Amino acid sequence: MTGDLREGPVAPAAGREGAAGDGPDEGEPGSTHAARREPEEFGSARFLNRELSWLDFAARVLDLAADPETPLLERAKFLAIFATGADEFFQVRVAGLKDRHAAGIRSRSADGRTVSEQLRAVRARATGLLGRAERIFSDGLVPELASAGIEVVSYGSLDRDARESLRGIFDRDIFPVLTPLAVDPGHPFPYISNLSLNLAVVVADPETGEERFARVKVPPLLPRFVALGDDRRLVLLEEVIAAHLERLFPDMAIGAHHVFRVTRNADLDLDDGEADDLLAAVEIELRRRRFGRAVRLEVDSAIEREVLELLVTELELTDEDVYRCTAPLDLGQLWSVVGFDRPELHEPAWVPATPPRLAGHGEEPVDLFAVLRERDVLVQHPYDSFATSVEAFISQAAEDPDVLAIKQTLYRTSGDAPFVTALARAAEAGKQVAALVELKARFDEQRNIVWARQLEQAGVHVVYGVVGLKTHSKTALVVRREPDGIRRYCHVGTGNYNSDTARVYEDLGILTCDPDVGADLNDLFNHLTGFSRTSASRALVLAPERFRPWVLEQVGLETAAGESGRITIKVNGLTDPEVVDALYRASQAGALVELMVRGVCSLRPKVAGLSDRISVRSVVGRFLEHSRIYRFGWPSASVLASCATRDDPAVAHRAAPRSVGSDARYFIGSGDLMERNLDRRIEAIAPVRSPELCARLEDVLALGLADDTHAWDLGDDGTWSRVRGDRGVSSQARLQELAVERSRRRHPAEQAG
């Protein structure tokens, strides 16, 4: 079964337009009092396809690019995000499907599709989305940008003076960089690099009339949009090059010319168990990746048949791999337009707030270690400042003479690399410093190699992870000598140690000197840097040893509680079949299951007898939702009393039924509910115990569930619908307001961190 559950023996739950979590009445098919069928009895149609679910997420991003309520340059940003995301999808997910197809793998996906069926479905869905993106650009953004004084114009529409101006730019800045490559018996078909923009040019010898093919690569280091003198008009670089092809092919007749772009398989084929030197092996594999198999060919819609056939043949593709485009190729290059200094076309600038307990007095910085000795601090970025919290934690540790050791995992770090600088400074000061640099962080491999070498040169002990696993945990450990002995200070987060993404990714982190968390991190780093096995943890939940069984145990506890059970989870992805089935069983037992899944989701909610009590939401807004929160059980009265949104009539805080104890367990961490996170990565999940900090998490969850501005709801048929309500709740805007309100309160007794 691969279709809608309604095609089979299972009918959708009735009346699901009501409040999320409303269950069926006693005796209805989904009632916990009716005979219950095991989830497996619903067949493969109980799962949604992972690849199509990712494309659904891309569609939600695309909706924001078309939303007239979104500021104009923010719409351009979302279109650029969609385009770059689509590139990665083809480089990794489609490439993986094609590899499986070529290998003759016959196994089906969780939703029952063969590889061929998935490839056909992906092509159909992707074609529609890419076509919509083109229309948004051509019919929406271009005319609206022109109205705002930013004109994207074609070369053919320019007057003589403008063309002369561009000719000067071409001769001075563009022509010296170009390299035309001919194709003939003495010049084989050139290698076309991944995601490069190219011109396919047909030239003819005027004397013989013989036609030849040539390729001109559009230089990636030059601006994609060439600005005319007044900077108000922009012309595509490839159009400027095409208008001056006679300079590249003098004495030849210029025939057809078309823009094309190739996408290649970009996944690393690396067996780290066989590699003697992982860094060298990754470098070799990165060079090989340049020559990955082509998986997609984008061409302009007017391309001549002969030219297209040549490209398809030489790139070893099929017609199914060709995508004809009516808009400019590579809309990801809109980032250069997004950066224009036009504040009125952007969202109002957001300056992250310093958490009150971390705010110093005047020029005197706060003593972070003294703050943490009082109690834990919870930070949520970008609402709370990353620079004055997490960066300051590592920087202060590097400078503090009483700090003996610093250990940190680095998965993706930023270009300015403040963490790399701080760790190097600490090592040069004689501290014991260890860094796990994950060389297999996709698309950041080369950057991480550079950081690893810099750290090694500074005297940092650098390791590259555990064989067979990717280290995805976001953890830092500081060991400090104090009057009463050695104390360990820790940070466990949901997001990378990256100053750039911390401004646009929503993430959480806890700063603590809890002895159990410190001991667990000590064991974890010994495992990462040495040969020790991870021992039983005291506070943290670590993957791969404990994450899967822990999730199933926690879900099982709420399942056993029946209608008194409650599960609320916020993650980026939910695709693991075993976890999905466990959540189905919780729903069948009567537990309330509230899921916030930003991206891919294989669970099908609101199906009678299977998932009546499950709701799935996705919030897609200005900031990329990236935090992972796990809450099991009902919040206590003390937690609810501490919620900043407790008196907000638009935000519903559900109190536990009278017959139910209030014992919610709260956790944050790096792991999603996907097989790779559960089984093939090192992840760290930390408990949050303080009622004040749990209230902060409760606010995040409640606002996400109440959002009727940037939220989507998943239906039983697998379609996502934009939530449109009359309350006007934007969870992200409200969290900004709460951060400002917290920063204005300075008395420690009022602060939760």
Segments (PLM) and residue ranges:
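N-terminal localization/anchoring segments of enzymes in phospholipid and broader phosphate metabolism
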Residues: M1-I567, R585, A589, C601-G753
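Cofactor-pocket helix-loop regions in the catalytic cores of large enzyme subunits
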Residues: N572
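Hydrophobic alpha/beta core scaffold segments
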Residues: L592-M596
